[in-house]
């Protein structure tokens, strides 16, 4: 790991210990499974967008004080396939309360929320599910082979999708192997019962996606050229997400041509006066290029 991820992992483990002291895992797990099943992630038309809510970015600083309910409502109205919500408190000013508010707001739109944080333990997936989340981000560099398998197994048990995040070709190889071990692959022939926590699984309703983050973890600068450089390493059986540095419709068109089916957009939408309009324009550009 890098220094930034080391610090984030250490802070995450400290919060995990505090959470364990407040609520035993057995109680939390029961609460998670008692929470109504969230909407599934539905990918349409060859190119999709995950919109992100965060109050702060380590590289850009504070992103404003937008109220979460109208902001995520605009994301859904613009056509976002899912909404990513930061829950990390120190660097991103996020919380589980933000996640729960977004989930409650978006249920009426049929749009799932995903927990974005520096997750290191299944307990944190139970927290997310109990807050109403339908998905979560897993960072492959923060997890051992065994831990990644444990996390993907837990997510599958909870009926949650995962975005497994990579930063380079070696990460992509590890992430893809971990997804293959822990999640059914996104195949049109693959189905699961709809009557329990499992999903109808196909490429349009994936259990797992591969995320590629173009941020340099030493400097926190974005390096968009990495999307093209890593395109040949992308697994064709998984939907792939371009993360960080996506700010314009042209960016969406470019990564769509490189083979990415999804973009995750955060800061640009948090700063936009009309986020729904920005999402529509980005989706149109990506779908025209895909």
Residue ranges and their predicted role:
Residues 230-233, 256, 269-290:
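C-terminal helical cap(s) of enzyme catalytic domains, especially alpha/beta-barrels
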């Amino acid at each position: 790991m890098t220094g930034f991820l080391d610090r984030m992992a250490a802070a995450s483990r400290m919060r995990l210990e505090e959470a364990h002291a407040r609520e035993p895992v057995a109680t939390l797990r029961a609460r998670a499974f008692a929470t109504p099943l969230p909407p599934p992630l539905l990918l349409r038309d060859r190119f999709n967008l995950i919109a992100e809510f965060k109050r702060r970015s380590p590289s850009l600083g504070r992103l404003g004080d937008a109220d979460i309910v109208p902001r995520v409502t605009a994301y859904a109205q613009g056509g976002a396939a899912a909404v990513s919500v930061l829950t990390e408190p120190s660097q991103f000013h996020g919380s589980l309360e933000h996640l729960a508010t977004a989930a409650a707001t978006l249920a009426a739109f049929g749009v799932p929320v995903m927990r974005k944080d520096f997750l290191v333990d299944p307990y944190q997936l139970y927290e997310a599910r109990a807050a109403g989340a339908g998905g979560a981000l897993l960072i492959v560099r923060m997890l051992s082979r065994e831990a990644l398998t444990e996390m993907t197994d837990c997510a599958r048990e909870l009926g949650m999708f995962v975005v497994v995040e990579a930063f380079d070709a070696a990460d992509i190889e590890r992430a893809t192997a971990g997804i293959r071990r822990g999640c059914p692959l996104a195949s049109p022939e693959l189905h699961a019962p709809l009557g329990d926590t499992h999903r109808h699984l196909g490429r349009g309703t994936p259990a797992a996606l591969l995320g590629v983050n173009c941020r340099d973890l030493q400097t926190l600068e974005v390096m968009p050229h990495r999307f093209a450089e890593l395109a040949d390493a992308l697994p064709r059986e998984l939907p792939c997400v371009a993360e960080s540095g996506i700010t314009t419709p042209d960016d969406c068109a470019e990564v769509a041509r490189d083979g990415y089916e999804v973009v995750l957009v955060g800061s640009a939408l948090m700063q936009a006066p009309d986020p729904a309009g920005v999402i529509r324009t980005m989706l149109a550009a990506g779908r025209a290029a895909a």
